[in-house]
């Protein structure tokens, strides 16, 4: 695998509501057009955050001026913000947007999304919207009801569409903000057979009944044969350490899953890019060893990611005034790659990088 070219989709403006451009994702539409989305705000987590959107019709070499088509509605009588949006093309020109909405009023003194004393989370909800004109206009947001076992819902992946048209949405659970009980984290899959109007009961993807292992930031994709591969940022709560990325595969549309498999690389997986021949390109961010973003390719959704195929997309240099090095704040100023197969057989990877006060959205195109 090799890097074809790279660049910046959008540059930040320090000290403004565009100071931190983070959590990027990209969709390649049936006509080859790319649509990128990302979070824009003064900081990575702020009440003034908005979602920006940009397009490219030349495989990422140039991008349109960012637009802001998505509103942050009030829900349940409180003000909130949309933190992240993922796009899915259900048929040519027909898009679905999945979003994670954050309650910004119920706990106004919260230092962030999580309560450091309880490990609970502020209220979060999942929203959907539809577009019939390739994302030029959008329907109003609609909330996806969640069972109580989920708690505040976390979205880390776009809605997936199976070959038979069934939609699959993966969701991670959280504790409520003031809940002092032990956290038993889980990640589940919901299914819809009516275009996302209603959703069935959750099917467990990852859950440790002892509460020792957490499966965070699940990134998933559908292979040409209909199988789903899911890659988890795996955390051991007893040793307080991140393990290697673990993969699970489903052969029945996400209703049952294989046991977790260590894929041999560490830290946080990207959304995988699946090529028409079944090959899978998986980028990942390694914050705690060499502070980089890398990628490898596997021959199939359940295949081995060849170390010989590895390329480095980004290497982060911690500032001299970050005395903790790999544990300092600077390691959180880059990351969250997202990959997508393009119509010419290449793969686009988008990610954010910069400093604590200014983060840009970057792109790299790979020849797998």
Report residues per predicted region.
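Asp-box/BNR beta-propeller blade signature and adjacent active/binding-site loops
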Residues: 1-368
């Amino acid at each position: 695998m090799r890097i074809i070219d790279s660049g910046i989709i959008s540059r930040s403006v320090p000290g403004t509501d565009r100071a931190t451009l983070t959590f990027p994702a990209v969709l390649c539409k049936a006509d080859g057009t790319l649509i990128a989305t990302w979070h824009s705000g003064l900081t990575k987590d702020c009440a003034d955050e908005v979602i920006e959107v940009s397009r490219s019709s030349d495989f990422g070499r140039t991008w349109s001026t960012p637009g802001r088509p998505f509103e942050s509605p009030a829900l349940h009588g409180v003000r909130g913000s949309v933190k992240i949006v993922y796009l899915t093309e259900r048929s040519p020109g027909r898009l679905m947007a999945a979003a994670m909405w954050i309650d910004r009023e119920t706990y106004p003194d919260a230092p962030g999304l999580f309560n450091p004393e309880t490990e609970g989370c502020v209220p979060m909800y999942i929203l959907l919207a539809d577009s019939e004109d390739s994302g030029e206009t959008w329907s109003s947001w609609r909330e996806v009801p969640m069972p109580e076992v989920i708690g505040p819902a976390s979205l880390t992946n776009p809605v997936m569409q199976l070959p038979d048209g069934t939609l699959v949405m993966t969701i991670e659970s959280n504790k409520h903000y003031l809940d002092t009980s032990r956290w038993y984290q889980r990640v589940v899959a919901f299914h819809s057979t009516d275009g996302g109007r209603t959703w069935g009961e959750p099917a467990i993807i990852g859950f440790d009944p002892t509460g020792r292992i957490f499966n965070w930031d699940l990134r998933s994709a559908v292979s040409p044969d209909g199988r789903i591969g899911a890659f988890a940022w795996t955390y051991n709560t007893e040793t307080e350490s991140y393990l290697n990325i673990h993969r699970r595969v489903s052969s029945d549309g996400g209703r049952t899953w294989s046991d977790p498999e260590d894929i041999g690389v560490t830290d946080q997986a990207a959304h995988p890019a699946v090529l028409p021949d079944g090959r899978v390109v998986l980028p990942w961010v390694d914050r705690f060893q060499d502070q980089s973003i890398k990628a490898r390719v596997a021959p199939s959704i359940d295949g081995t990611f060849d170390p010989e195929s590895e390329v480095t997309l980004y290497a982060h240099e911690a500032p001299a005034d970050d005395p903790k090095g790999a544990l300092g704040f600077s390691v959180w100023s880059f990351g969250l790659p997202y990959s997508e197969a393009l119509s010419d057989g290449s793969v686009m990877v988008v990610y954010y990088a910069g400093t604590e006060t200014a983060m840009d959205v970057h792109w790299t195109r790979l020849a797998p």
